[in-house]
């Protein structure tokens, strides 16, 4: 069973507008990246010391998120048939200047998966509840038009893995509460539409 397109588009349009009105993408600029940078430094400094000799300190390192874009949202029934998943795809770039390496720019594509579920009160009335919210990295790729140096090649895998862990754990902690607030303030008619969709799916199954 698929979510009717006319219902899905109403809900995704409202969510998209709410994200844009709430400056959702600007939240990325407020996320503390110091921990991420320190983790990357800790993991690659030893290898770089071996490859190129003693390095300067972390004052020569910099990281920032930039060029964030919100892509087309979508809805689908959860695999367990007990709710609806909202998929929110994001694209962004990560600029990284690391010690003596040339500056790197990594392209990131990640999906936010937020689950909506039903809860009932003592009177048997249903309300929409915000369930699990996770970030799933889909792609982390170095943007470059030039051949990679031996040094960059040696540390790139470590950087990509560390960035992936950060997206899954820290970035989700920064963005998911805002999604929760947005869902809590959805138009009542849209909330009722979502509740009815979940109930109808449960009855079919």
Swiss-Prot record:
GO MF term (any one): lipid binding
GO biological process: surfactant homeostasis
Localization per Swiss-Prot or TrEMBL: Secreted
Keywords per UniProt: Disulfide bond, Secreted
Pfam family, any one: LBP_BPI_CETP
Disulfide bonding pattern of the chain: 133-176
GO cellular component: extracellular region
Top-rank taxon: Eukaryota
Keyword Disulfide bond annotated: yes
Oligomeric form and interacting partners: Monomer.
Family per record: Belongs to the BPI/LBP/Plunc superfamily. Plunc family.
Function: Major protein in sweat, has surfactant properties.
Protein name: Latherin
């Amino acid at each position: 069973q698929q979510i009717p397109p006319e219902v899905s588009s109403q809900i995704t349009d409202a969510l998209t507008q709410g994200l844009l009105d709430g400056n959702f993408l600007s939240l990325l600029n407020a996320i503390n990246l110091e921990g991420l940078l320190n983790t990357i430094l800790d993991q690659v400094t030893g290898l770089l010391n071996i490859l190129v000799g003693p390095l300067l300190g972390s004052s020569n390192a910099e990281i920032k998120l930039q060029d964030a874009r919100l892509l087309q949202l979508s809805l689908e029934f959860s695999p367990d048939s007990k709710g609806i998943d909202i998929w929110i795809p994001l694209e962004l770039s990560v600029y990284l200047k690391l010690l003596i390496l040339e500056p790197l720019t990594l392209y990131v594509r990640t999906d936010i998966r937020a689950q909506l579920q039903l809860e009932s009160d003592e009177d048997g009335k249903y309300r929409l509840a915000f369930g699990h919210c996770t970030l799933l990295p889909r792609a982390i790729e170095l943007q470059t038009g030039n051949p990679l140096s031996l040094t960059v090649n040696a540390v790139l895998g470590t950087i990509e893995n560390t960035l992936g862990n950060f997206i899954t754990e820290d970035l989700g902690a920064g963005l998911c509460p805002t999604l929760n607030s947005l869902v809590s303030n959805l138009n009542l008619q849209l909330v009722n539409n979502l509740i009815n969709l979940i109930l109808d799916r449960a009855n079919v199954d």
